[in-house]
Every structure is written in structure tokens, then in C-alpha cells.
């Protein structure tokens, strides 16, 4: 049986230093139409502790996550990024997230809203 999300953690010397989540069920993701289905996972919640940023730890976790999802039978992964986050967009493009799927608006529990661009990548088998 498949869960609704799959967390990934980067651990160094017993300490979680980075994390990401693969959303496997659209019922827990905003704007999920076209982003999540039985063969597509939506990637979110990317975090790295500041003192470990820029050292390649998250890249290693990200590559592992993509390979693991491919091995689990997923054919595509998607993610969202705010349009002004140009540095992150360049990183995602580098990883092959070049298919623009759609634009949308996401909201937080406090009422804050953000514009988001959604991109996809095919996982090669």
C-alpha cells in the first residue's frame, strides 16, 4: 500500500541537515491537478540547515530522491517555485525541470498567498 507522502532526510553525523518530501496523493497538495497522479510525484518542502547550504548535501539527497522515486515506478516528478526565486529556478532547470506545467497561487494558514510556477521532469528508465 502506498502512503500519501514520502519524506527524505539528509543525515550527517547523526543530525538531519536537509530534507525534502515527495507528495504522492493530490489531496494534500494545493493546485495538484496535473502535478500528482499514480505515476507522478510532487516534490516539496526542500530545506537545508543554513550552515550546510552550498556544500552539495541537498544535491546528493535530491539525486537520491529522484532515483528512489524512479525505482518505485514513478515516471515523472513535478515541483513549484516562486517566479522571483531565479537562483532556485536555475538549479531546477539544471536538474531537468524544464517542462512548464502551469502557474498558480498557493496560500498559507495565516492567509499569505504566493504565486508559483510549476515545472516537471520525466524520470528516465
Feature-to-residue mapping (PLM):
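Short hydrophobic/aromatic beta-strand element in the GNAT-like acyltransferase core
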Residues: 5-9, 19, 45, 78, ...
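Conserved beta-strand in the GNAT
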Residues: 9, 15-26, 30-31, 42, ...
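A short, acidic/glycine-rich surface segment
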Residues: 26-33, 102-108
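Conserved acetyl-CoA-binding loop-helix of GNAT-fold acetyltransferases
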Residues: 48, 54-67, 93-94
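Conserved GNAT acetyl-CoA-binding A-motif
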Residues: 69-81
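Conserved beta-strand-loop-alpha-helix junction that forms the acyl-donor binding cleft
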Residues: 79-89, 106-110
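Conserved acetyl-CoA-binding loop of GNAT-fold acetyltransferases
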Residues: 92-102
